[in-house]
Regions:
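A well-ordered secondary-structure block
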Residues: 114-197, 206
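Pro/Thr/Ser/Gly-rich low-complexity, intrinsically disordered linker/stalk tracts
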Residues: 393-422, 489-492
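Cellulosome-associated attachment modules in secreted, modular CAZymes
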Residues: 395, 436, 476, 482, ...
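N-terminal, active-site-proximal structural segment of metallo-dependent hydrolase catalytic domains
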Residues: 6-142, 177, 202, 217-229, ...
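Acidic, glycine-anchored loop motifs typical of Ca2+
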Residues: 107, 111-124, 317, 497-505, ...
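Recognizes extended acidic, P/S/T-rich segments that occur
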Residues: 429-464
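Metal-dependent phosphoester-hydrolase catalytic domains
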Residues: 8-10, 156, 175, 181, ...
C-alpha cells in the first residue's frame, strides 16, 4: 500500500499539543463510550455526549480507534422516542459511525436532521474512513474499530476482520478451556499499512469483557481472556511455528493459510472490567499478555517471539491518575496490550478533559459549546491512548532507469530522463551532474511517489558536447536507495551537427544553407540570437573544418 501524507507531529500537552512525537508513530485509542454512539442519539452540535466524543477523537487523531458499548439505543435513553429501542444492526451502526466521522443527513431520527457534530468537522485534515462493526452482540451493544488505513486480509482466510471465535480444547495447551471469547465477542481487524512507512502491517484486537463482581462474572472474564490468549498465539503466531492454528483448535473457516509477517504486530485493547493492580488475582489483561506461563520471560507468551506481551500503565499527564472510569484514582479498567518484540511503546496516557489546565486544552475543544472540563462527564470511561514505534520498511527498490539509454550520444540540450515506479517509495529525487559519482549536481528535482516518472531538464543547464551523469534515488522512512540501474551517462550533440549523426559535414552544410536563406529559423541559429546569419556561418565553418561534431 502506498502512503498518504501525514499530519505534522507534536507532543506538548501543556501547550495544547496532543499529537505524536513522530508522524510515523502509530496511535491506538480505546474508548468505552457508554452507549452514546447509537443510531437514535441526537447528532447536533451542543452540550451533549455525541459532540463531546467527536471533539475528543478529533483532538487525539488516532490511527486506529476501538470503541466499545456502541449501538445501545435503550441504554442511551433515545431508542423509545425514535421507535427503535434495541441494539443497532451491523448496517445501521456502520451508517451511524459514518455520520459520526463525516456528518450527513440522519436517517434514524425523526425529521432526518443534518448531523452538525462530527469528527472531520473538528479535524478537517483527519479521517477514519475504514470501519468494522462486530457481528457479535449481547443484545445491548457492539464493539467497533475505525482505522485511518484500509483493512486487508493479512493471513489468507478471505476476511479482513472477525467479531469473535470459538475454540476446542488443546491438550498441549491446557491453560484454556473450550468456548468463545465471551458475551460480546472479541474482534480482530487486519490493517494494511503504507509500505513506504512501515515494515509490516497491523492487527487490532478489541473487546469489552463481562462486567460485574459476582463469581460468574469473574470466571467468565478469566476464561474469555485465556481463550483470547490462545487465539492470538495460535492464529497469528502459529504457536511459534510457520502454520496458523497448527493444532486445528480454532473455528476460523475458511482457515488462514499463513501467519503474520515478522514485522506485523498484534495489539489488543478495550474494557477488560478489572484493574490488574488491585484485583487480587491474575486477571484478564495479565492472561492475554502472558498466556500459560506464571513467570515473566517464559517461552509460551502471546508475543510473536513467545515471550510475554506488554500492557499499559497509562496516566493522566497532569495528575498521574491512572483511573479510566469515574473519579476513583485506582479504577483502571481499560487497557492496551501489545507484542513488544515488534511494537515499541513511545508513550501512553489517559485522556481526561476534567483535569486539564485551561492552557492545555486541545484546539478542537474550542468547538464544544460549553465548559471544556465537562467533556469527560458525558461518558463514564476515559480514552486510553498509546503511541507505538513500528518497524521501519526496507529501503525502496525497483525504480529502474528507462531512458535515454546509458552512454547515449547526440542528445538535445533539454533531454527527458525517465524511470519506473519503485516499491515502498515516499519520494524520488533526480540528480544530474558532470561527475560520475553525482557529486556537485548541476540539477536536482524532487518528485512525489505518485510521479511523474520522467522530467525534462530545463534550458540553460547543459552544454553542447558535454557529458553528463544522472540517476534517481528513492526515499522512505527506512532510508534512501539509488536506482538499481546505477548511474547512467549521456552526451549532448555537437553545436552544428544539424542532422545529429555525430559529424559536421556536407549534409549539414546543405541544411545550414537552407536555414541561412530563411534567416528567421532556429535550425541554424547556433548562437541563439533568433537568426541564422553570418555569425552562425562562422561557427559552422569552424565545426565543418573539425568534422567531428564533438572532437
Amino acid at each position: 500500500m502506498s502512503g498518504a501524507s501525514l499530519a505534522p507531529a507534536q507532543w506538548n500537552p501543556a501547550n495544547r499539543q496532543w499529537g505524536k512525537d513522530d508522524a510515523d508513530d502509530y496511535r491506538v485509542v480505546t474508548f468505552n463510550i457508554q452507549d452514546r454512539i447509537c443510531s437514535t442519539n441526537l447528532k447536533q452540535e451542543g452540550q451533549n455526549a455525541w459532540t463531546a466524543i467527536a471533539v475528543q477523537i478529533a483532538a487525539l487523531k488516532p490511527d486506529v480507534l476501538v470503541m466499545v458499548e456502541c449501538g445501545d439505543n435503550n441504554a442511551n435513553g433515545t431508542g423509545a422516542a425514535q421507535g427503535y429501542d434495541t441494539v443497532d444492526t451491523v448496517a445501521r451502526l456502520t451508517t451511524t459511525l459514518n455520520l459520526f466521522v463525516h456528518g450527513g443527513t440522519d436517517p434514524y431520527v425523526a425529521g432526518n436532521p443534518a448531523v452538525t457534530a462530527y469528527v472531520t468537522k473538528y479535524a478537517p485534515t483527519f479521517d477514519l474512513p475504514y470501519m468494522y462493526v462486530s457481528d457479535q452482540t449481547d443484545n445491548f451493544n457492539r464493539n467497533v474499530v475505525l482505522s485511518r488505513f484500509p483493512l486487508a486480509d493479512l493471513n489468507g482466510d478471505a476476511r479482513t476482520a472477525i467479531g469473535t471465535f470459538t475454540l476446542s480444547a488443546d491438550a498441549a495447551n491446557p491453560y484454556y478451556t473450550a468456548g468463545n471469547a465471551g458475551v460480546r465477542g472479541f474482534l480482530f481487524a487486519e490493517i494494511n499499512l503504507p509500505d513506504d512507512r512501515y515494515g509490516g502491517d497491523f492487527v487490532m484486537g478489541g473487546g469489552h469483557l463481562k462486567s460485574g463482581g459476582a463469581s460468574g462474572d469473574l470466571s467468565e472474564r478469566l476464561v474469555a481472556s485465556q481463550r483470547i490468549a490462545y487465539y492470538i498465539d495460535a492464529i497469528f503466531n502459529g504457536l511459534g511455528g510457520n502454520t496458523p492454528d497448527p493444532n486445528f483448535r480454532c473455528s476460523n473457516f475458511p482457515r488462514p493459510n499463513k501467519v503474520l509477517t515478522a514485522q506485523t504486530p498484534v495489539v489488543w485493547a478495550g474494557d477488560f472490567n478489572e484493574d490488574e493492580l488491585n484485583n487480587g488475582r491474575d486477571g484478564p489483561v495479565l492472561w492475554t499478555t502472558r498466556a500459560a506461563a506464571t513467570s515473566p520471560g517464559a517461552t509460551d507468551g502471546t508475543d510473536r517471539d513467545r515471550t510475554d506481551s506488554s500492557y499499559d500503565d497509562s496516566r493522566d499527564p497532569f495528575t498521574n491518575n491512572r483511573n479510566t472510569q469515574g473519579s476513583n484514582a485506582n479504577n483502571k479498567l481499560d487497557y492496551i496490550c501489545w507484542q513488544d518484540s515488534i511494537a515499541v511503546l513511545r508513550r501512553s496516557f489517559v485522556f481526561r478533559a476534567s483535569t486539564m489546565p485551561s492552557t492545555a486544552t486541545p484546539p478542537e475543544f474550542a468547538n464544544f459549546p460549553g465548559l471544556y472540563f465537562n467533556i469527560s462527564a458525558f461518558t463514564d470511561h476515559r480514552a486510553v491512548v498509546a503511541d507505538f514505534v513500528l518497524p521501519s520498511p526496507l529501503v525502496p527498490s525497483g525504480h529502474v532507469l528507462t531512458g535515454p539509454a546509458d552512454f547515449s550520444q547526440n542528445l538535445g540540450k533539454q533531454p527527458t530522463l525517465g524511470w519506473t515506479a519503485g516499491a515502498r517509495v515516499s519520494s524520488y529525487q533526480l540528480a544530474v551532474s558532470t561527475n560520475s559519482d553525482l557529486s556537485s549536481p548541476i540539477y536536482t528535482a524532487p518528485v512525489p511517489s505518485s510521479g511523474p516518472y520522467s522530467l525534462q531538464i530545463p534550458a540553460g543547464l547543459l552544454a553542447n558536447c558535454g557529458t553528463y551523469y544522472w540517476s534517481v534515488s528513492a526515499t522512505n522512512r527506512g532510508g534512501t536507495a539509488l536506482s538499481p540501474s546505477g548511474v547512467w551517462s549521456f552526451q549532448v550533440r555537437g553545436l552544428c551537427d544539424i542532422n545529429i549523426d555525430g559529424f559536421v559535414d556536407d549534409t549539414d552544410f546543405v541544411l545550414f544553407a537552407t536555414a541561412y536563406d530563411l534567416f528567421e529559423t532556429p535550425d541554424g541559429d547556433f548562437n541563439g540570437d533568433g537568426f541564422t546569419d553570418d555569425a552562425d556561418f562562422v561557427l559552422f565553418a569552424n565545426a565543418y573544418d573539425a568534422l567531428l561534431a564533438c572532437p
